[in-house]
Amino acid sequence: MVYGIIGENCSGKSTLAEGIKEAIGAEIITGKDYLRMAKSESEAVILFRKKLESAVSGENLIYVISEPEQLVLLPNDAVRILVSADIDTIKERFKTRMHGNLPAPVAQMLEKKHGVFDSGSYDYRFDGVRGDMSAFCESLKEKEDKR
């Protein structure tokens, strides 16, 4: 099965991806990591789409998406999970990632992008701040075991 974990920077996507990986066993591919699959971007996209399509009914694969243009790579049958966080939490996490400094232009960029995924269609919505990751991952595992 393919799990698309979708959300803004610092919303909790990678943490959730690791939890799901541990619960069901899966490969994680983040953002444009698929570019390593080939020398050219166009060839890498083709190979990655094939990998995703074969994973829909095969081995588990988690694709972590933080840019809207990456959504087109997800197969129609993928499980789509939106991970969200409030803007203050996102800024604080980003500040930590940047060693305690959040320049004003970066803060403005985060504010501008906030909510960019909210209107999409998702199978699940997970709160990356207050969500119970253990319970969520266990629920996915139970559904995976029934497949």
Model-derived regions, located:
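Conserved substrate/cofactor phosphate-moiety recognition/catalytic segment
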Residues: 17-57
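Small-molecule kinase domains that catalyze NTP-dependent phosphoryl transfer to phosphate-bearing small molecules
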Residues: 99-147
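The conserved Walker
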Residues: 9
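Walker A/P-loop
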Residues: 14
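Pre-Walker A (Motif I) flank of P-loop NTPase domains
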Residues: 1-2
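Conserved phosphate-donor/acceptor-positioning beta-strand/loop module used by diverse small-molecule
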Residues: 76-96
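Hydrophobic anchor at the beta1->P-loop junction of P-loop NTPases
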Residues: 5
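Loop/turn-to-beta-strand initiation segments
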Residues: 57-63
